Amino acid sequence: MRHGDISSSNDTVGVAVVNYKMPRLHDRAGVLENARKIADMMIGMKTGLPGMDLVVFPEYSTQGIMYNEEEMYATAATIPGDETAIFSAACREADTWGIFSITGEQHEDHPNKPPYNTLILIDNKGEIVQRYRKILPWCPIEGWYPGDTTYVTEGPKGLKISLIICDDGNYPEIWRDCAMKGAELIVRCQGYMYPAKDQQVMMSKAMAWANNCYVAVANAAGFDGVYSYFGHSAIIGFDGRTLGETGEEEYGIQYAQLSVSAIRDARENDQSQNHIFKLLHRGYSGVHAAGDGDKGVADCPFEFYKLWVTDAQKAQERVEAITRDTVGVADCRVGNLPVEKTVEA
């Protein structure tokens, strides 16, 4: 893991993250103009960072937040589509992989159902190699239709990459899911605003440490007329230490080199802090001393997760018993979310 240079090597993946200024757009023409601006920025960055293998732009950086519902549906894109064609051309010209936001991506039943909040990973040949749909939209504000799975893709120089989006990152489960599928770099694209800056910076660092993985965060900056976005895009080592972090500046960039061999060596040879290994080999020292085998205990000890998998409805009811049983809150209503209990069919 190295920071401070503009290079990369056969063993290091040069990763850049961008504090892209949150755009305020209203129509397809504006979206496509902004997509071309992102493409131009990427190509320019490659000149300044010749070692750059991967560049990451924030959530909402392409379309902005459409606060008008009609505009949200009217600007919802297809994948592939006009926006992705612009990004693919830039990836080819810059000979660089890119991660871009599509908010939203048309639902299969468009326009009868809300769009998805989607990230795409495009390789240096211009091919879309991963499409991730946000699993945990930022309720109650975000009205995106939720996705249902994470992915791992072999990226530049073989580094294994997963994508997550903004509020996804507040749930340890999604990080663990990516890591246990083999992700070595988890990319978190955000359109995160104040007041939750400190919590979000802390969460990404903690999850890098807990999952023995690299983390790259790209967050929006600026004010879009509604929210103020705190930036602080960052690249974090698999030991939880920050390699590089921007401030709040619009269009700020950070860059670091992530060693492929170093993370694989750590996962194979580290012991006391090898969290992903130890989780599935619980208490192996004591189990071995007892003569009960040399693998520790693999069984899941967490009753909640067992219940969630075997009876999701009962798990939901258990959560409601310690929180609330409606999605809306009577004392602070948001939209038309119900504040009286409803029964699902």
Swiss-Prot record:
EC number assigned by the record: 3.5.1.4
GO molecular function terms attached to this record: amidase activity
Active site: residue positions: E59 (proton acceptor), K134 (proton donor), C166 (nucleophile)
Class of enzymatic activity (EC top level): hydrolase
CDD domains according to UniProt: aliphatic_amidase (cd07565)
Catalytic reactions on record: a monocarboxylic acid amide + H2O = a monocarboxylate + NH4(+)
Residues in CN hydrolase domain copies: 13-260
Keyword list, A-Z: Hydrolase
HAMAP family: Aliphatic_amidase
PANTHER family on file: ALIPHATIC AMIDASE (PTHR43674:SF14), NITRILASE C965.09-RELATED (PTHR43674)
Family: Belongs to the carbon-nitrogen hydrolase superfamily. Aliphatic amidase family.
Subunit field text: Homotetramer.
Function of the molecule: Catalyzes the hydrolysis of short-chain aliphatic amides to their corresponding organic acids with release of ammonia. Hydrolyzes propionamide, acetamide and acrylamide. Enables the organism to use such amides as both carbon and nitrogen source.
Name of protein: Aliphatic amidase
Organism for this UniProt entry: Rhodococcus erythropolis
Lineage start: Bacteria, Bacillati, Actinomycetota, Actinomycetes, Mycobacteriales
